[in-house]
Structure formats: C-alpha cells, structure tokens
Swiss-Prot record:
<dbReference type="InterPro" id="IPR025747">
    <property type="entry name" value="ThiC-associated_dom"/>
</dbReference>
<comment type="similarity">
    <text>Belongs to the ThiC family.</text>
</comment>
<feature type="binding site">
    <location>
        <position position="433"/>
    </location>
    <ligand>
        <name>substrate</name>
    </ligand>
</feature>
<feature type="binding site">
    <location>
        <position position="460"/>
    </location>
    <ligand>
        <name>substrate</name>
    </ligand>
</feature>
<keyword id="KW-0862">Zinc</keyword>
<dbReference type="GO" id="GO:0008270">
    <property type="term" value="F:zinc ion binding"/>
</dbReference>
<keyword id="KW-0784">Thiamine biosynthesis</keyword>
<comment type="pathway">
    <text>Cofactor biosynthesis; thiamine diphosphate biosynthesis.</text>
</comment>
<dbReference type="GO" id="GO:0051539">
    <property type="term" value="F:4 iron, 4 sulfur cluster binding"/>
</dbReference>
<keyword id="KW-0949">S-adenosyl-L-methionine</keyword>
<dbReference type="Pfam" id="PF13667">
    <property type="entry name" value="ThiC-associated"/>
</dbReference>
<comment type="function">
    <text>Catalyzes the synthesis of the hydroxymethylpyrimidine phosphate (HMP-P) moiety of thiamine from aminoimidazole ribotide (AIR) in a radical S-adenosyl-L-methionine (SAM)-dependent reaction.</text>
</comment>
<feature type="binding site">
    <location>
        <begin position="353"/>
        <end position="355"/>
    </location>
    <ligand>
        <name>substrate</name>
    </ligand>
</feature>
<feature type="binding site">
    <location>
        <position position="333"/>
    </location>
    <ligand>
        <name>substrate</name>
    </ligand>
</feature>
<feature type="binding site">
    <location>
        <position position="437"/>
    </location>
    <ligand>
        <name>Zn(2+)</name>
    </ligand>
</feature>
<feature type="binding site">
    <location>
        <position position="584"/>
    </location>
    <ligand>
        <name>[4Fe-4S] cluster</name>
    </ligand>
</feature>
<dbReference type="InterPro" id="IPR002817">
    <property type="entry name" value="ThiC/BzaA/B"/>
</dbReference>
Amino acid sequence: MSTTTLTRREQRAKAQHFIDTLEGTAFPNSKRIYVTGSQHDIRVPMREIQLSPTLIGGSKDNPQFEENEAVPVYDTSGPYGDPEVAINVQQGLAKLRQPWIDARNDSEELDDRSSAYTRERLADDGLDDLRFTGLLTPKRAKAGKRVTQLHYARQGIVTPEMEFIAIRENMGRERIRSEVLRHQHPGMNFGARLPENITPEFVRDEVAAGRAIIPANINHPESEPMIIGRNFLVKVNANIGNSAVTSSIEEEVEKLVWSTRWGADTVMDLSTGRYIHETREWILRNSPVPIGTVPIYQALEKVNGIAEDLTWEAFRDTLLEQAEQGVDYFTIHAGVLLRYVPMTAKRLTGIVSRGGSIMAKWCLSHHKENFLFEHFREICEICAAYDVSLSLGDGLRPGSIQDANDEAQFSELHTLGELTKIAWEYDVQVMIEGPGHVPMHMIQRNMTEELESCHEAPFYTLGPLTTDIAPGYDHFTSGIGAAMIGWFGCAMLCYVTPKEHLGLPNKEDVKQGLITYKIAAHAADLAKGHPGAQIRDNAMSKARFEFRWEDQFNLALDPFTARAYHDETLPQESGKVAHFCSMCGPKFCSMKISQEVRDYAAAQAIEVGMADMSENFRAKGGEIYLKREEA
C-alpha cells in the first residue's frame, strides 16, 4: 500500500501527463491479434500471450526444445492494447460500429438535442475549455422503428455485433492444438447452456430470449460489442466517477483507460460532482467498452440535491441527455415502491443504495408511488429509440449480513420481474441488479429467485460481500461471494475495491478491485465448465512445472506484480531460469523433486522392460532366430 499522498493539483497533473503521453501498449510478451468475421470490418481483438519453448533433452551444447503454443485471451483494452494504433484522447476513438448502424437505415440524425439541459450546456461559452471538441451529432430511431439488438434478434436478424461477440466469446480456443492445454474438468453449470462453439445464431437466440443483453447505444459507435448473459463468459464491471470533493475530468478518463487495461468489460460513470455532462462526454468518446450510469444521480444535481424536489420532467430530460450522448445502460430504481419502504424499518442498516434511498425519500415526502415505476413505459420508449439497455436497480438490497434475503429485498425483486416483461414489450434489453451483503450459505437462493422471478434475464450483482468485518479488504470479502454467485449463474459482477465503505477509489484501488473480480469471474467460468476456460490455467501449470519463469509472469492476470514478487528475493537473471524459487530453495522444491521422480520412474520402466525382454529371451531358449510358429 502506497504511503505517498499527492495534493489535488499533483493528482490532476499526473492524470494529465498520463493522457498526454498515452499510447497503445501490450502486456509483456503479448501481441494484439485480430480475428476477422464474414465481412472485412468485423475485426475482433484478442491478446495472444507468446510462450517460450520447453527443454526436452539433448546436451548442454545441443539442447532439444519443443515449442509451446501461444495462448489467446479475451481483451477489453480496445485500441489502448494495440501498439500499432495512434491514441489521441482529444479526438476520441475510431467509430467502429458506425457503418453497421448506418447500414441498417432505421435511425436518423437529430437537428437539435432533445434535452433542454444539453442545449443549455452547449450554449455556455464558459465551458468551452472543458468540453470535448469532436461532439457527435446524435441519432435516434426513425418514426415507427426500434433500433435495439433485442428487436433485431426477435426478427431473426444476426447483426454484425452478434457475429463479433460470437468470435470474441470463443476466445480463439479453436487455435489450440495441444491436448494438455485443451484438457478440462466437467463443470457444474446449474442449468446454464454452454455450447462447445458459440455461433452468431446462438448469440441471437440468447438475446431474443432475454437471457442475454448487448449494451450498444447507437450513439456510442466507439464501443466494441460484448454480451452479458449466464451462458457466456462471466463479465466484470468497474465503477468510476467524480464527486463533489474529489477527482477531475482528466482523472476519470485515466481511470477509464486503466479499467479497460485491467479487464473491465463495462464501466459505470457514477459522477456526482461538477461537470457531470462534460466528464461523461470525454469518457464515452474514449471508451471501447459499454458505459452505464445511474441517471437519478444527475437528476438530483439538477434540483440542488433535494430529493423531494425531483420530478419526472427533470428525470426524463436527463434520460434524453444521456441517451443522446451514448450511454449504453441505465440503472433505474423503479422497483422501490411506496409499500416496500416500511419493510426496511426493522433492518439493521436500512436502505443503503444511494438511488434507492433517494426514491424512498421522494415517495415518503410526497406519499406517492415511485415516479420511475409510474412512468416506466415512457422510460422504455426512450430506451427503445436509442438502444439503451435497462439495468433494473436493487434499491432495497441488503447493506449488512443481518439484512440479507429479507422481505424488502425479495419484494423488490419480484417487482423487477414484472418490469422486465414490460420492457420486453418495447424490445428493450434488461438485466437485473442484485446484492449486496449475503453470507455464503444464503447466496444461491438469490440466483434461483432471480431466475424464477425475472424470467432468466441476466443477473448483475455487487459482490455479494460474505462478511462485514473487513473494511479495507472488502474486495476479498466480496470476491468470495462474487465467485460463488458467478458459478450459480450470475452474468456480470460489479467490482468492489479496497476503499469500499471508506472512500473514493484511486487508480491503484481500481486495479486491485478489477484483478480480484477477474479472478472471481474466471473461477466461476471454471466451475461452470465454460468451454476453453481452463486453457490458461493449464498453460500456467505446465510453465510452472517446467520452471519457465518468464512464461509464468506473462500468463498471470497481473504480470508486473508476479514478476516483482519473484524478484524481491531472486532479482538476478539467473533466478528466472533456476529450477526452484525462494520459497523452498533448490533442495526442497516439490516441482523439482517431482521431475526427478518422473525421470526416475521413466528410467525404471525402461529397466524393467529390458529385464522382461531378457527373461523372455532366455525362456525361448536363447535363440536369436525363432521358428515362425514360435514367433
């Protein structure tokens, strides 16, 4: 843990330097590859980890080696992971999906922004220095049209996004020839459908059934298509965002890039401070992954932070503002109903969701039903016009172990299931948010309740944290629950950083949270038996047994930390070819002893085989040539 504390000015300057010097960067001994689809502009990025050969024999002067296959892995870093791409944050990323969106001919550019707030911001010359310069002209569905991936899937259409995803989800595993690498234990998938090969048609069918979503706003053409669903790889979300007391636009863009480098499949911008609109524009124009928001946060800012003053009109304007900027999914707390709020009175920690508490306060102060629930169909109409997915928020999630799985939590979940069906009427894609704080033995019920109540819509959970006693280590306490619920069928895990319950995460906290959750997601994929999930583990184990230290570092989720820990005790280059590590030393290394046992067993087998042949030779009378009938 770093003890260096930077001033606000120093933090901003450091972030600005990061942005100014940003360039495409590969991980150690990795290279960016692209797998092309049926049309030339479907180019799916992957990272290929290059491995060194295995010494199999020969002499000191003439060693014999066997090549090890490169290992392809899923890559969320977009252009930031390609050294061949010139990065310019001021200009934003290339608009990868724009030709696909235009070719469908079901959307049109707007003459003006639909949001009054956006028009006010654009007219304010005082914001020119903060504003992203290359603003997109927003698009919206033509009259009578729907532009959602769910709509296309229901029409039987395989979109370029779906083909892109099918290639991406297969992770290049068809390239692997080694039986050692391809070996995989059968998993326990709790009813998930995990085909050996994911096809574009399978992607289409899962989206059409509502079991998966493709967050892909038509105004975010820079994003690389990805999918969230329990029959696909478990995904991880990272939260970023400024607050009234800390962080700047530069720092949030830096966190975005940093998040994609360390494996964030989506990023949520939870900004609540100044310049929310401008910060979000910079993030969207530079994001290769889907961006989610909680619109009620910004709507609250527009009424000076007074929950009672919120109105449907202010919220609707915020939805239009964010949809036309390109936000890919909205968290909407429409399930916090007036009649559920009293259920939380006997809780130890009450309502811990920020959005949930805002809506509960509004309901109580007006003694009216939640206006998000009352206007839900209008929300769906807006989402259908831009292809904004809905993430139905768990505003009544438990904030402590004591409150887990209570009446309030599951009452809201059942309402979210009802809202899911309404959203599907409008061809709007839906996922369901989940807890929270839940002890291990109570986690599986959350998954089974969600599947039943919400009609198998994808589940997206914050952890859950499995104990409340570890502030500063809640990435661990929640990572345990995340791995379990991912195994049971949760489609996406929202990361928790070491700063959870303590403060706003910095860049290093973001990395720690992401690494923890990538471990949890991968462990869940292994447990489910997701095809190809074990390839990287097998490659690591083989490298470990063969003392290929450089390959072990490079196959790690965090190669830099793995190398640093090794080099703390064996920094010399000779330590990277040694057949031992500092934990056991040369005489007690279990791997080295195992190799010696294997070599001894092989030699013994040869010796026993020779003895058997000798005995057989003597039994035949010691004749060099045998008669035909004796042979």
